[in-house]
């Protein structure tokens, strides 16, 4: 009986430490934007923090695309849809309420940008290793998505890169 009670308490403590999708996204963007503006010249895709917040498949695809010479699949930062970001914009971060979506969650994110404006993104999350992780980000403000999940585009980019190395 004591063993059952101990196991129950242990399971309850694990459950209470699991983050909500909203907390995951908020924590991710606080970390990521701070790192983005620091520009420490390290590849953030390799960091343990990224593995904590971003789905494995997404990180793998971003690394694959990043290694393709002159690729045109990702033309801005995938998680911000920006080329640059200013530290003074970070406090304007706002995260919406998660909604169910195809077995995962989706929520809106507003990033502060120049002139006090906001850029609206939509983050898609799924459970991985018992945690909510970001696997897809869409720029809602501009109706645009960097198609990192398009295998044909990745193959075409690789083929194009191969022709560049022949010259």
Describe each region flagged by the PLM:
Residues 21-25, 46, 153:
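Stable alpha-helical elements in mature extracytoplasmic
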Residues 101-105, 115-122, 128-129, 135-167:
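Low-complexity, intrinsically disordered terminal/linker segments enriched in charged
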Residues 54-117:
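Surface-exposed, charged secondary-structure patches
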Residues 33-67:
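Short, solvent-exposed secondary-structure junction/capping segments
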Residues 20-21, 41-42, 113, 117, ...:
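Extracytoplasmic/periplasmic, Sec-exported soluble proteins
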Residues 1-4:
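Positively charged n-region of N-terminal signal peptides that target proteins for export
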Residues 13-15:
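N-terminal signal peptide c-region/cleavage motif recognized by signal peptidases
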Residues 20-37:
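Short, aromatic-enriched amphipathic alpha-helices that serve as compact interaction elements
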């Amino acid at each position: 009986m004591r063993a059952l009670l101990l196991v129950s308490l242990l399971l309850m403590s694990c459950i209470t430490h699991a983050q909500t999708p909203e907390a995951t996204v908020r924590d991710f963007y606080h970390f990521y934007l701070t790192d983005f503006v620091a520009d420490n010249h390290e590849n953030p895709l390799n960091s343990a923090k990224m593995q904590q917040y971003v789905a494995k498949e997404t990180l793998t695809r971003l690394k694959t695309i990043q290694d393709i010479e002159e690729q045109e699949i990702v033309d801005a930062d995938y998680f911000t849809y920006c080329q640059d970001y200013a530290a003074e914009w970070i406090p304007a971060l706002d995260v919406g309420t998660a909604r169910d979506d195809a077995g995962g969650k989706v929520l809106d994110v507003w990033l502060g940008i120049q002139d006090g404006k906001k850029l609206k993104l939509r983050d898609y999350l799924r459970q991985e290793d018992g945690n909510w992780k970001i696997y897809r980000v869409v720029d809602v403000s501009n109706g645009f998505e960097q198609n990192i999940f398009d295998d044909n585009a990745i193959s075409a980019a690789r083929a194009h890169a191969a022709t560049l190395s022949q010259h």
